[in-house]
């Protein structure tokens, strides 16, 4: 009988696929790069943040103060779309419980690729309301990513915005000094700090790359994020398949 690949997460009280929690750190770096890329590119092309909520709430408040209702609606729509992506990723994950061998993260990344390519095409084609559609597509893609990839090596990560990463970084460091009796699995704060710093650096590098690409290539510059997602998707699928073969042989 094939071993089930699903476990109950003790930290969040939710069912998540084990291949997500055991994913290698390079995937987290790649997704953080994509998160920074999409957020910066979205701001350059659509003047809104597509990867997190806080910045858009501030921009929305400024737009309200300036009585710019069109801009207000734009920022709010991006916020709602990003938040919808999180529970949507959970709904997409449910069918994978029946097919443990299927790869959840590659599926999410495939959907991201479709959304990003569609967003780039819409903006490049100068269709009506192209900027708004672009922002909604990219924010939905990053919302899905944020909901699908949330934990690695036992710590929470956020690959689409730095606020969560900095919070995790500070709290991890604080726990190092505040906790007298720490369980053995959590006694490696140094490696966790390095991991969070590296993910944050990947996000910043992605933001700089994304901004440079869209400033030079305009809407087509977004395809760089889609290309990286395709590479990550193929790599994750191959690793998942090899892991399943080893499990069956064992």
Each model region followed by its residue ranges:
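Alpha-helical transmembrane segments of multi-pass membrane proteins
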Residues: 2-250
